[in-house]
Amino acid sequence: FVNQHLCGSHLVEALYLVCGERGFFYTPKTGIVEQCCTGVCSLYQLENYCN
């Protein structure tokens, strides 16, 4: 997993992959779209959104 742009369904799929059974919280207010879609994010940054 390298730092990459993740938008829309790709972002959701990546969160499912990273978080697994823990699940994740996805609200527009968290800035994940700005971080991962507008910019790039790492696996470690995605883990911050897991429950």
From Swiss-Prot:
Disulfide bonds join C7-C37, C19-C50, C36-C41. CDD domains: IlGF_insulin_like. SMART domains: IlGF (SM00078). The keyword Secreted applies. GO terms for cellular component: extracellular space. Insulin decreases blood glucose concentration. It increases cell permeability to monosaccharides, amino acids and fatty acids. It accelerates glycolysis, the pentose phosphate cycle, and glycogen synthesis in liver. PANTHER family: INSULIN, INSULIN/INSULIN GROWTH FACTOR. Belongs to the insulin family. This is Insulin.
